[in-house]
Amino acid sequence: MASLKEMRNRISSVKATQKITKAMQMVAAAKLRRSQDAAESARPYARRLASVIANLAAGVSGDGAPKLLAGTGRDDRHLVVVAAADRGLAGGFTSSIVRAARAHIDGLIAQGKDVRVVCVGKKVTAQLAKPYAGRIVETFDLSSYRQLTLSVAQPIADVITREYEAGETDVVTLFYSRFKSVVQQIPTGLQLIPAVVETGEAASGPTAVYEYEPSEEAILETLLPRNLTVQILSALLDNMAGFYASQMTAMDNATRNAGDMIKRYTLEYNRSRQAQITKELIEIISGAEAV
C-alpha cells in the first residue's frame, strides 16, 4: 500500500494536470468561437460561387464543357486528398477522418483502381505514411499558419490541378470533417473533380435569359479553378472549427476525470491517515495500560 507521502504527491500531480486540462479547455473554447465564425463567414461566398457556376454550367454543352467540369470520362485513376489536424489532444477527431478515407481508398484498391493520396496535416501523414507509402504524392504541414486563407489552400489546389492536367488522375475526392455543431462533426468525402454541380444551386424563381461575353465556357474556365480553391479552404475552416470543438470536449472530459481521481485519491488518503492515527492511539493506550 502506498505511503501517505506518496498519496499526497499523487493528489498534487493530478491537481496540476487538472489545471493544465482546464486551461486547454478554455483556450480551445476561445479559439472555437473564432474558428466557427470564420467557417460560417466563408459559406455565403462559397454558396454564391456554386450558384453562379451552376447557372453557367446549365448552358454548356458536353463537348464544350471545361475539363474540370466534364472530367475525363473515366474513373480508373483516383486522387484522394485527406485533410485533418496538425495537432493532437482532440479525441478521435483525426482518426475518424482517416478511418473514412481509408475505407474509401481500400474500396477503390479492391476494385483495381489506381489510387494516389495527398496528406494535409502532420497527423494524417503519420497515420497514412505506412499503409500507403508508395501512393502518397504530396504532404502538407499547416501548423505554422496562424490564419487560414486562400493562399493556404492554393498550394493544395495547385497539386490537384497539376496531377489532373498531367493525366495522372480522373477523379479527385477530398476527405475532411464537416462542422455541423459543437458536438457533431461529420467525416465527409467531397468530390472535387469532376466538379459536382447541384441543380438546386441555381437561382430559384423566374429565370432570365442572359447573353454572356465572353462565353459560358470561358467564364467557367476561370471560375472552376477558383471554386476548387474555395472548396478546399472551406473544408480546412470546417476542420479547424471541428478540431477545437473536439479538443474542448476532450479537455472537458479530462478535467472531469481528473476531478474524480482527486476525490478518489483524497478519500483513500483520508482513510489511510485515519487508520494510521487509530493505530497510533491504540499503541499509546496499550503502552499506558502496560505501565
From Swiss-Prot:
One of its GO terms (cellular component) is plasma membrane. Transmembrane segments: none annotated. Keywords: ATP synthesis, Cell inner membrane, Cell membrane, CF(1), Hydrogen ion transport, Ion transport, Membrane, Transport. GO terms for molecular function: ATP binding; proton-transporting ATP synthase activity, rotational mechanism. InterPro entries: ATP_synth_F1_ATPase_gsu, ATP_synth_F1_gsu, ATP_synth_F1_gsu_CS. GO terms for biological process: proton motive force-driven plasma membrane ATP synthesis. It is a peripheral membrane protein. Pfam families: ATP-synt. SUPFAM superfamilies: ATP synthase (F1-ATPase), gamma subunit. It is found in: Cell inner membrane. Its main location: membrane. CDD domains: F1-ATPase_gamma. The keyword Ion transport applies. F-type ATPases have 2 components, CF(1) - the catalytic core - and CF(0) - the membrane proton channel. CF(1) has five subunits: alpha(3), beta(3), gamma(1), delta(1), epsilon(1). CF(0) has three main subunits: a, b and c. Produces ATP from ADP in the presence of a proton gradient across the membrane. The gamma chain is believed to be important in regulating ATPase activity and the flow of protons through the CF(0) complex. Belongs to the ATPase gamma chain family. This is ATP synthase gamma chain. It comes from Caulobacter vibrioides (strain NA1000 / CB15N) (Caulobacter crescentus).
